[in-house]
């Protein structure tokens, strides 16, 4: 066993261990449960069944020898896992498809979010008593903890879990009780955030396609088995197993009869590695397509239809008081002009009540995500520009709206060339006015069909950065997307990159479709088909554009990815 550190996404260092390392062996990553640390995993890593694997594990933030404090955002733990996978791939020349990941309890939530949101091409996953929903024994416990976070920003709560409800093994109970590195505290906001993440993953596990095995402890006094079963039943994985372990407690790895779990786990891992499916699937995912069709046909209970009809009526009646709602009603809530207003995030309206309505509107979770998407988009664009010679940078945005974030780039990097394709005349007029006002050169608009493959030959332009932002989810048909992707792949400079956004999950899809109008005009609804990150990445991969980096907001709504030609 070696003790090491890696740099995570935010520049902090995280402690990790490696066992049994030899080149060309298959690799396991193990994520420990909350409150614990990676050294406790020795019990599994040194078992003879697992000596044939390279094994890596790290101490989560706020745990063990990792010095960083706990983060209140559960997505930071998912980003850490993404950073760790990238690190061991680079440091040890390990292929992504040769990695299998095992996670216990809270670690299972982190791992599930990683495969759902980042869609890595790993071999498979094992979830041991995943904590999608924690058992709360005090009435209104979640509400009380939420209130505590409002009163005290860095509030902590103590775990009620005792060693005697983790394992029947007395020796393991004693080890747990005497381990000074075990931390019984947990950040209160993180506890709430993990609960919300667990709920999201259970409801949307259809987006997960990897081989998955779940071990559920029959006598689990810490988490609810019902959530694990619902998660399993929704999975799209063709290879999956759910095993309920009779008389087992929550700490499955440390239980008395752990050897039978180790055997089943090893058998599953070997089978996965032996029968890996590397076929690229670019077909529309059935769950997403059906969700889109149900929304388009408005096939919802009458109570929901009435509820959203009231919202729509209220918005059309009183929306004029809010500047943001007024712009949405006039130009479409998904229009470039509407998004410009969202980005500014400055409440405006008629009278005090108008400003109040506008602030409520701007604070909606979807709009907060859109603003975060812009930040992430700018971050990846700047990262790519800085890897190139500024004066030789040529950017193409296939559907750039008014050019909002591109103007931020032009202001910071005046030497670059920017071409903005946009079909909406009102957006072009707004954008051209900004260009004229700033006396910018080498930035202009064109008006072509971004879904016509021939467009990209006609423009006679060889970009080294292509941007596709906020457009693909507006169209259901994957063939249209392939026309765009294949077209840009043909003209992209060999050292170039495509930066594209995704929307793997959105809590307001139904509300948006039934209440808000689109930029397409004639009162058409703002209807979207979200795509799982796996589906979206596969469409780019088909044309040899391989995702190298991805950023995501804390709520898991919008992704921004950078792909390069293989």
Q: Which role does the model predict for each range below?
A:
Residues 402-414:
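Conserved SAM-binding loop of SAM-dependent methyltransferases across substrates and taxa
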Residues 482-494:
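A short glycine-rich, Lys/Arg-flanked "PGG" loop and its adjoining helix->strand segment in the class I
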Residues 322-386:
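Class I SAM-dependent methyltransferase Rossmann-like catalytic core
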Residues 495-502:
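Conserved beta-strand signature within the Rossmann-like core of class I S-adenosyl-L-methionine
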Residues 45-67:
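Conserved alpha/beta-hydrolase
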Residues 35-37, 64-92:
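Catalytic nucleophile-loop/oxyanion-hole region of alpha/beta-hydrolase
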Residues 208, 214-216:
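Short beta-strand/loop motif that positions the catalytic acidic residue
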Residues 243-292:
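Catalytic active-site module of serine/aspartate enzymes centered on a nucleophile-bearing elbow/loop
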């Amino acid at each position: 066993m070696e003790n090491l550190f890696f740099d995570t996404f935010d520049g902090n260092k995280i402690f990790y261990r490696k066992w049994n390392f030899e080149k060309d062996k298959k690799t396991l990553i193990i994520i420990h449960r909350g409150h614990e640390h990676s050294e406790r995993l020795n019990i599994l890593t040194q078992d003879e069944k697992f000596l044939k694997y390279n094994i890596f594990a790290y101490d989560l933030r706020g745990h063990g020898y990792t010095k960083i404090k706990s983060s209140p955002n559960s997505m930071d733990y998912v980003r850490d896992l993404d950073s760790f996978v990238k690190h061991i791939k680079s440091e040890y020349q390990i292929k992504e498809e040769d990695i299998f990941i095992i996670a216990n309890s809270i670690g299972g939530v982190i791992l599930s979010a990683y495969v759902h949101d980042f869609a890595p091409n790993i071999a498979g996953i094992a979830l041991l008593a995943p904590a999608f929903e924690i058992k709360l024994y005090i009435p209104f416990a979640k509400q009380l903890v939420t209130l505590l976070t409002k009163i005290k920003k860095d509030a902590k709560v103590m775990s009620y879990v005792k060693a005697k409800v983790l394992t029947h093994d007395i020796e393991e109970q004693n080890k747990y009780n005497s381990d000074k590195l075990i931390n019984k505290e947990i950040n209160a906001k993180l506890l709430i955030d993990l609960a919300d993440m667990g709920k999201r993953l259970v409801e949307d596990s259809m987006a997960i396609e990897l081989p998955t095995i779940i071990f559920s402890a029959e006598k689990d006094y810490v988490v609810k088995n019902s959530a694990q079963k619902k998660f399993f039943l929704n999975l799209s994985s063709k290879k999956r197993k759910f095993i309920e372990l009779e008389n087992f407690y929550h700490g499955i790895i440390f239980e008395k009869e752990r050897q039978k779990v180790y055997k089943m786990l090893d058998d599953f891992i070997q089978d996965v590695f032996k029968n890996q499916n590397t076929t690229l699937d670019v077909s529309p995912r059935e769950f997403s397509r059906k969700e889109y069709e149900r929304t388009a046909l408005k096939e919802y209970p009458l109570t929901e239809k009435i509820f959203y009809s009231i919202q729509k009526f209220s918005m059309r009646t009183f929306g004029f008081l809010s500047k943001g709602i007024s712009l949405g009603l006039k130009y479409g809530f998904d229009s470039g002009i509407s998004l410009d207003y969202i980005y500014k995030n400055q409440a405006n309206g008629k009278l005090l009540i108008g400003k109040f309505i506008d602030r409520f509107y701007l604070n909606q979770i979807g709009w907060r995500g859109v603003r975060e998407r812009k930040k992430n988009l700018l971050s990846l664009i700047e990262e790519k520009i800085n890897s190139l010679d500024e004066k030789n940078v040529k950017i193409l945005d296939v559907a750039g709206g008014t050019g909002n974030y591109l103007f931020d780039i032009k202001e910071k990097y005046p030497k670059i060339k920017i071409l903005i394709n946009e079909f909406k005349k009102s957006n072009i007029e707004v954008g051209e006015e900004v260009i004229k006002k700033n006396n910018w050169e080498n930035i202009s608009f064109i008006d072509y069909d971004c879904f016509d493959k021939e467009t990209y030959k006609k423009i006679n332009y060889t970009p080294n950065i292509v941007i596709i932002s906020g457009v693909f989810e507006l169209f259901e048909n994957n063939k249209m997307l392939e026309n765009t992707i294949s077209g840009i792949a043909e003209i992209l400079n060999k050292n170039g990159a495509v930066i594209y956004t995704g929307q793997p999950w959105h809590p307001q899809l139904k509300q948006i479709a039934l209440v808000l109008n689109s930029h397409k005009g004639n009162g058409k609804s703002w209807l979207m088909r979200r795509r799982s990150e796996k589906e979206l990445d596969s469409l780019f991969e088909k044309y040899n554009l391989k995702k190298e980096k991805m950023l995501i907001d804390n709520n898991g709504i919008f992704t921004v990815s950078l792909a390069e030609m293989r």
